[in-house]
């Protein structure tokens, strides 16, 4: 998998699929989710709440990825990835498992290009470097060879931090 790091607004980086942050209640309440709600209106929020209602649940388990429409955003669909628990805790392993679930779902949807913010780093406890550590080993997974992942960060400082973490994790993973 080719991993690109870009500074900007994740909602403006066109890709086949956006893997977005999500909380267990699938509420579009802040950060990237709040930006989705502002850009698209209540349609996606209603779709996510309908999903919960149809499942007979009020929240999804940690690691769940739920697909929705993308509205007027430059994606074929949005994959809402829950990489935090109800207390907003997370780990490198949980982020990696959640990203893998999202990438698998994206591939099944026929995606070749995927964009994502750094999951569990806003309201969640993870650092940008932790996210890099979680994602780096996936670059060498054969099942992801045909896709590219663009990780979108908000600053040049975060881009540098993420690049260093991914580079360091790749070196230690090869040992």
Residue ranges of predicted features:
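Phosphate/ribose-phosphate-bearing ligand recognition and processing surfaces
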Residues: 84-175
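Glycine-/small-residue-enriched capping loops at alpha/beta junctions
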Residues: 1-108
């Amino acid at each position: 998998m080719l991993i690109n790091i870009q500074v900007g607004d994740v909602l403006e980086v066109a890709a086949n699929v956006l893997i977005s942050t999500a909380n267990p209640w699938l509420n579009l309440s802040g950060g990237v989710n709040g930006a989705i709600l502002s850009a698209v209106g209540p349609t996606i929020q209603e779709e996510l709440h309908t999903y919960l209602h149809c499942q007979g649940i009020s929240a999804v388990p940690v690691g769940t990825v739920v697909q929705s429409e993308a509205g007027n955003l430059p994606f074929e669909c949005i994959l809402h990835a829950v990489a935090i628990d109800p207390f907003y805790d997370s780990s490198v392993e949980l982020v990696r498992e959640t990203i893998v679930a999202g990438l698998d779902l994206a591939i099944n949807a026929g995606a070749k290009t995927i964009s994502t913010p750094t999951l569990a780093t806003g309201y969640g406890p993870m650092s940008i470097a932790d996210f890099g550590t979680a994602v780096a080993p996936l670059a060498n997974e054969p099942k992801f060879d045909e896709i590219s992942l663009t990780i979108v960060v908000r600053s040049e400082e975060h881009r540098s931090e993420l690049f260093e973490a991914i580079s360091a994790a790749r070196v230690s993973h090869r040992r």
